[in-house]
């Protein structure tokens, strides 16, 4: 039975990916910073013999190493990695602080890199696959998204380069780039910016709606599966046509 580690797996896209992969027969380890959220996620997934929660912060390199090691120790190996942990910060560049820069890059970029670095030796043995989570903001510019877009663009570039490094070992590395998704992160964004409405967000999309977490999750599951066995180095928009405008 295949095993996947999903960072940021206690809510949003990560939790949806955990549910989809469980349905498809995977063992699933999820990580997150808050134990109570992790326990709630395990209860929601309702498959105790095939799920495992690891408390940790992807901004900490030692925690990233431990997440991988605990997954391998508990399930006996690692076949897939999904780096869905991330934070969003909207604001004009002149209002960005050094602390903002450190926080977003530590979580969105360095956390992704660290997890992949520690996972690669284990994935090489299977071989396994990696799916990183970027954003439409990593593919095109957005007002008040210079910092966030920089982190997500870095994830895309990292994914494409790592795919070339890993290909000789038959490890595939791909990236999903969602637009706005109906997640707790989106709800927080709307609370923080009351001048932004859900309807205004929908108007950006040719399909005139926001994504559901399961739609992104199923794309992740596809990229991890043998159905995508000849796909690597791809940054795949899951954005209702937003980046096609």
Regions found by a protein language model. Give the residues of each.
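Alpha-helical segment proximal to the catalytic Tyr-Lys
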Residues: 121, 164-168, 229
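Short, small/polar-rich loop/turn modules that mediate ligand/substrate recognition or access, typified
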Residues: 82, 167, 172, 231-233
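Active-site helix of classical SDR
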Residues: 116, 151, 159
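Conserved glycine-rich cofactor-binding loop
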Residues: 10-11, 34
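Residue(s) in the substrate-gating loop at a strand-loop-helix junction
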Residues: 135
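Short C-terminal tail/terminal secondary-structure segment
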Residues: 140, 221, 232-245
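Substrate-binding pocket helix/loop in short-chain dehydrogenase/reductase
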Residues: 92-93, 100-105, 201
